[in-house]
Each structure stands twice: as structure tokens, then as C-alpha cells.
């Protein structure tokens, strides 16, 4: 299975923010869309990603004053990305190796989607269910 298959199932919409968005505005957007990370974009495209984990760590370090600061202060600027043609298994390894749960998808230099570990698990569960149904059909039809 490829990343393109995951995006086909979940859609390619990506919630983005600009680097000067405040952490408070970031949190409001994450709550509104019920998501765990937002991609930070500038005029030239992807510049970073900010996750719930980034916010929690920085709040612990800097306190509530962080809420009025721009997300550029806390974003991860070296972003792990993948491509639509990449295998889901490869992405799973990448997520584990880099300890990230959200990976932007880049196609032809443009942001084409985002895949979370939850999306990967859901897709894999659907794949396993289809395999199970095929095996049950094979068994009941006498192989």
C-alpha cells in the first residue's frame, strides 16, 4: 500500500498556518479541526510543522508567556516528509525512527497532504479486514 492510497481514503486537506500565527491561535485551530499538528507554510511553501508535543514541551520550559509568541518560535523546521508513491511500511519506519506522528506529503515540490500515525493504523486495519474477508471466502468456497 502507498501513501497515495491513504490520502485517497482520508482526503488531502491540510490545515496550515503561517509562521507568525500565535501559539494561542495554533491551539484554537487544532481544537477546531480536532487535529494533533499543523503544517507551517510561508510564501515558498513548507517551512515547519507544530505538534501538540511541541506546544507541551515549550510550555513546560517557558510558561504561559509562550501563548502569545509566534509558532516560528516552537515549530520543527527540519520536517520529515514523504511522497505519494512511498510505501506505507516505509513511512511507518520513518515515523518510528524520527519519533514523529504527523508527516506532510510532498508531490512535485508542493504540499499534497498530511498523514498521521492514526491514518496509517486505520488504513492498515481496513487492509487486514479485506484480507480476512478474502480468506474467509476462500475457505467457505472450498479453496
Language model: regions and residue ranges:
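The conserved cystathionine-beta-synthase
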Residues: 16-34, 40-41, 81-99, 106
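A glycine-centered beta-loop-beta connector
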Residues: 30-33, 38-54, 95, 103-118
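Tandem CBS (Bateman) regulatory domains
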Residues: 1-12, 51-80, 86-96, 117-143
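Generic leucine side-chain signal with a strong bias for well-ordered alpha-helical environments
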Residues: 7, 26-27, 46, 91, ...
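Short, charge-rich amphipathic segments
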Residues: 21-32, 63-74, 109
Amino acid at each position: 500500500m502507498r501513501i497515495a492510497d491513504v490520502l485517497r481514503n482520508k482526503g488531502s486537506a491540510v490545515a496550515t498556518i503561517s509562521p507568525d500565527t500565535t501559539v494561542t491561535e495554533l491551539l484554537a485551530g487544532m481544537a477546531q479541526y480536532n487535529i494533533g499538528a499543523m503544517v507551517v507554510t510561508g510564501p515558498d511553501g513548507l517551512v515547519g510543522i507544530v505538534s501538540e508535543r511541541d506546544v507541551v514541551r515549550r510550555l513546560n520550559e517557558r510558561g504561559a508567556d509562550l501563548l502569545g509568541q509566534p509558532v516560528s518560535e516552537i515549530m520543527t523546521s527540519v520536517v520529515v516528509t514523504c511522497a505519494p508513491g512511498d510505501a506505507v511500511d516505509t513511512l511507518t519506519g520513518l515515523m518510528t525512527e524520527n519519533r514523529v506522528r504527523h508527516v506532510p506529503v510532498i508531490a512535485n515540490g508542493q504540499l499534497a497532504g498530511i498523514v498521521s500515525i492514526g491514518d496509517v493504523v486505520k488504513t492498515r486495519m481496513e487492509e487486514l479486514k479485506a484480507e480476512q474477508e478474502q480468506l474467509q471466502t476462500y475457505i467457505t468456497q472450498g479453496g
